[in-house]
């Protein structure tokens, strides 16, 4: 019921992958990290956009380099095999959404790298695709963990039948 309408498939879950309990330590983030992050976001936001004669934003298309495209296709073919073998419709739906998200991740990562002066913004390169794959795999694993938790709490069909037979109000005494 909770995932039958497809809404939950659209959520990117963040689940810590802690194999061991976290250890306390004295490591601190640099004091200027927040300012650096704000500067990156501000530079992205301040980008000039070309407008067409109707005042609408003119899209700027970033194509993939050949090696980046090859790697992305390789990942998608492997991901499709996982999808073909999956019997749970909810999981299949999650996989299909992630195939769309990975393209968006590529664009976000490439522009973030450009903002940090690591690359240009004329195309999406292999390093960006590799990072987008890692991010997508993380979100896949998190979604599978969430589905596992939801399924643990789901009633079996026999349990649901019994619950449905109960009167609207009753006591356990």
Predicted regions and their residues:
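Phosphate-handling catalytic cores of nucleic-acid transaction enzymes
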Residues: 1-173
